[in-house]
């Protein structure tokens, strides 16, 4: 390169620098004096090339990012709808697989029947697909575009658009609507249960002074005391009971217990039943209606059915016996010594009291028959005698005092004093549940769960042998009974005979629960569990019927027989044989009038 060429290049560079950076003239002349070394020139060239490369890459990535904006992002409504569809389909179990199969088959069939599907722009495939996942996909199509399903018959030939157009097909079948409705109904049940259990959480968090209730876009703030009121709790419990029965009725009527039976029904029958329903109610064909017409028709359908009272709430609540008891609870006329709401898995205290009132009356009806009274007395004798035999004791003395108790209850002269004795202990209703199940059995189990520290120290002492521990436990039980005898106001009353029975039974049960893990412990635990299971069963709508006193008494009798047979079977043939040989005389019946006392 000649000197002239170098000078020209330097001149042009200086001129460019002056024009770009608007340098002063003085700077321009000073630049002419600057000379760059070869290393500086190389660094300048590398920097310039790098800057150009960075600018080019930034522009390239910016274009790619602009193209990706057209794709569905994870947080956009379309993607969320598909994710919700997958979750709903996975929860359906076997119906999920059938829904996917229907989607796959429909994808292949739409190519062959492209012209046919376009006959109904807004619902041409109304009965072609089933499953909750497809019905959720139809919601997207209704909200976005009604003509995207079959807007152009030639679009079905494009492989890239098949999946998208398939999801947008409005698949509004009766089965899908039923499944979606049941999902929303179950969600409502969960919300109501949370509202009912809010009262228990209120005690744990007393700092909360208000609660927000969401209703659409409006949010109302009300105090906890106004919402969690007694009247509100009663109404919510009654609503939940009606909702449970309504759910069971729908499942029994429409085959809700087997989701596959709904999802796999033939499309022809579904179409026919839907058209017949529309024709009977005088509504236009749903196949040729848009979303607005469908909404209006659904409103008319609901109004007509409500007017006809075909699906009224009362028709799904065949429990007038329970409803009457609930009204008495709201008026404060039902009393219970102990509220066992959580133990018996009731919805609330009102639910427990209402069921308790029904159970009391049912037991009155059961004990009105002599056969039932004899059965209960004989069953109690066998079970307790077998427990004593398992503890290697002679049940003869126990059976004698047991017979004395039965003879005492048969004498009408002692009924008034017995009622006073029990009322002083909080038992105001002379009933099989209140006296036997609650006061005697459940209180005994609770006392054995929390024994005195003196008994615990003896039982947990490793240096003492089992026989000494058993004797110490028996002595502790007898000392407690002796103290209770001293507090009795009537020396020969109900509690005198009851404590006489406890002298033989309490040491056996105490050693059975607190002693070593042997056959006696297993039998005592089984006896306790059967009592608890029986109580839970009679307080469960799924196990007994609260429609009337007769049906409830019938179910209680069946449960009594079932639990007693299980206990007798578990006792073993040897224990029963020994107990039978020691039995003196025939069994005595429980007095009728005492156990048939009216519930106040």
Swiss-Prot record:
The keyword Ribonucleoprotein does not apply. GO terms for cellular component: mitochondrial outer membrane; plasma membrane. It comes from the Eukaryota. One of its GO terms (molecular function) is protein heterodimerization activity. It is a multi-pass membrane protein. The modification Phosphoserine is found at residues 257, 261. Disruption phenotype: Mitochondrial fragmentation: mitochondria become round and show loss of cristae. Female mice show decreased quality of oocytes. Mice lacking both Miga1 and Miga2 show strongly reduced quality of oocytes and are subfertile. It is found in: Mitochondrion outer membrane. Coiled coil: none annotated. Keywords: Membrane, Mitochondrion, Mitochondrion outer membrane, Phosphoprotein, Transmembrane, Transmembrane helix. The chain crosses the membrane at residues 15-32, 38-58. InterPro entries: Miga. One of its GO terms (biological process) is mitochondrial fusion. Its main location: mitochondrion. Regulator of mitochondrial fusion. Acts by forming homo- and heterodimers at the mitochondrial outer membrane and facilitating the formation of PLD6/MitoPLD dimers. May act by regulating phospholipid metabolism via PLD6/MitoPLD. Homodimer and heterodimer; forms heterodimers with MIGA2. Interacts with PLD6/MitoPLD. PANTHER family: MITOGUARDIN (PTHR21508), MITOGUARDIN 1 (PTHR21508:SF3). Belongs to the mitoguardin family. This is Mitoguardin 1. It comes from Mus musculus (Mouse).
């Amino acid at each position: 390169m000649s000197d002239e060429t170098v000078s020209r290049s330097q001149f042009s560079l200086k001129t460019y620098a002056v024009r770009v950076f608007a340098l002063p003239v003085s700077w321009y002349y000073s630049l002419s004096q600057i000379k760059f070394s070869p290393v500086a020139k190389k660094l300048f060239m590398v920097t310039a090339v790098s800057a150009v490369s960075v600018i080019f890459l930034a522009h390239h990535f910016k274009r790619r990012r602009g193209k990706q904006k057209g794709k569905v992002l994870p947080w956009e409504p379309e993607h969320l709808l598909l994710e919700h569809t997958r979750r709903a389909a996975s929860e359906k179990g076997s119906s999920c697989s059938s829904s996917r199969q229907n989607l796959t088959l429909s994808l292949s069939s739409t190519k062959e029947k492209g012209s046919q599907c376009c006959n109904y722009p807004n619902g041409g495939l109304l009965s072609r697909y089933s499953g909750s996942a497809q019905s959720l996909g139809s919601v997207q199509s209704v909200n976005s575009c009604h003509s995207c399903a079959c807007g152009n018959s030639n679009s079905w030939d494009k492989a890239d658009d098949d999946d998208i157009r398939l999801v947008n097909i409005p698949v509004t079948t009766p089965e899908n609507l039923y499944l979606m409705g049941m999902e929303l109904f179950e969600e409502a049940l969960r919300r109501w249960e949370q509202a009912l259990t809010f009262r228990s959480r209120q005690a744990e968090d007393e700092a909360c002074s208000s609660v927000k209730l969401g209703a659409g876009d409006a949010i109302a703030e009300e105090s906890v005391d106004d919402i969690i009121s007694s009247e509100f709790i009663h109404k919510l419990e009654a609503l939940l009971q009606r909702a449970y029965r309504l759910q069971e009725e729908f499942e029994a009527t429409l085959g809700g217990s087997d989701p596959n039976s709904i999802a796999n029904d033939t499309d022809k029958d579904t179409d026919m039943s839907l058209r017949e329903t529309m024709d009977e109610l005088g509504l236009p064909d749903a196949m040729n209606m848009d979303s607005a017409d469908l909404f209006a028709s659904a409103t008319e359908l609901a109004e007509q059915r409500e007017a006809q009272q075909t699906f009224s709430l009362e028709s799904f609540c065949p429990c007038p016996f329970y409803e009457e008891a609930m009204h008495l609870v709201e008026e404060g006329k039902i009393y219970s010594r102990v509220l066992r709401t959580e133990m018996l898995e009731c919805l609330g205290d009102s639910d427990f009291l209402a069921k308790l009132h029904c159970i009391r009356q049912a037991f009155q009806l059961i004990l009105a028959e002599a056969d039932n009274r004899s059965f209960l007395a004989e069953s109690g004798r066998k079970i307790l005698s077998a427990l004593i035999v398992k503890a290697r004791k002679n049940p003869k003395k126990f059976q004698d005092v047991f017979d004395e108790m039965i003879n005492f209850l048969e004498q009408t002269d002692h009924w008034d004093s017995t009622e006073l004795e029990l009322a002083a202990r909080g038992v105001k209703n002379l009933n099989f549940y209140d006296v036997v199940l609650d006061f005697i059995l459940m209180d005994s189990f609770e006392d054995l769960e929390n024994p005195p520290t003196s008994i615990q120290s003896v039982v947990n002492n490793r240096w003492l042998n089992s026989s000494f521990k058993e004797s110490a436990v028996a002595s502790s039980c007898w000392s407690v009974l002796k103290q209770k005898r001293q507090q009795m106001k009537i020396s020969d009353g109900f509690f005198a005979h009851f404590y006489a029975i406890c002298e033989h039974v309490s040491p056996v049960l105490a050693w059975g629960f607190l002693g070593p893990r042997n056959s006696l412990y297993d039998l005592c635990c089984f006896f306790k569990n059967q009592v608890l299971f029986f109580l839970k069963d009679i307080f469960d709508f799924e196990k007994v019927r609260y429609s009337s006193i007769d049906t409830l008494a019938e179910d209680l009798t069946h449960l009594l027989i079932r639990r007693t047979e299980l206990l007798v079977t578990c006792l073993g043939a040897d224990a029963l044989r020994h107990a039978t040989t020691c039995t003196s005389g025939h069994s005595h019946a429980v007095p009728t009038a005492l156990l048939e006392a009216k519930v106040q």
